[in-house]
Design a protein with these regions (language model features):
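C-terminal accessory/tail domains of diverse enzymes
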Residues: 1-171
């Protein structure tokens, strides 16, 4: 069980000759501000980031980079949501790759706006999802906020209980 799984074969050894059909990403937190837990904008941003990571040069020492990444991930995850990213966070490499990708493929304003949102979130932690949740914490809990959202989403979903609402644009 990991954050990314290879999919498409019933037996792992089959990946060697038959290949990977798709990747399953399992590490996304649900966005409570979105009725279906994730927005199309977020999915498009993740897609663009994945392409940018493929675009970037590989690290010369992958094991060392992964170890440093795990340490940095823990540091960021345990920091206050409004705390700026640590200085060792190499956001410039990512944003440069995003800019190059958008320019190389002639992607339009929508994708340029996605890159701008990523840059803005790197520079200003108040734009992150974690920071947006801060005002909703009452007595060190998000329970009241979560219940309010759940009830509102439930009520909306039952306006036409036979329809799978919210996924129409994702088909």
């Amino acid at each position: 069980y990991s954050a990314v799984r290879f999919r498409g074969q019933k037996v792992n050894r089959s990946f060697l000759d038959k290949g990977i059909t798709y990747l399953e990403f399992r590490n996304f937190d649900l966005n409570p501000f979105e009725r279906i837990g994730i927005s199309q904008t977020t999915m498009d941003t993740v897609h663009l980031l994945l392409l940018a990571f493929l675009w970037m040069d590989a690290s010369e020492n992958v094991d060392q980079s992964l170890a440093q990444g795990h340490v940095l991930n823990e540091k960021i995850a345990l920091s206050h949501p409004l705390e700026p990213l640590p200085s060792e966070t190499e956001t410039q490499n990512i944003t440069t790759a995003l800019d190059q990708l958008v320019q190389h493929f002639g992607l339009g304003d929508y994708h340029q706006d996605l890159v701008k949102q990523v840059k803005d979130a790197f520079a200003d932690p108040s734009q992150t999802l974690a920071a947006q949740l801060l005002p909703h914490i009452k007595d060190k809990s998000l329970a009241d906020f979560a219940l309010d959202k759940a009830l509102a989403y439930h009520d909306y979903d039952w306006t036409a209980h036979y329809a799978l609402k919210g996924y129409e644009e994702m088909e």
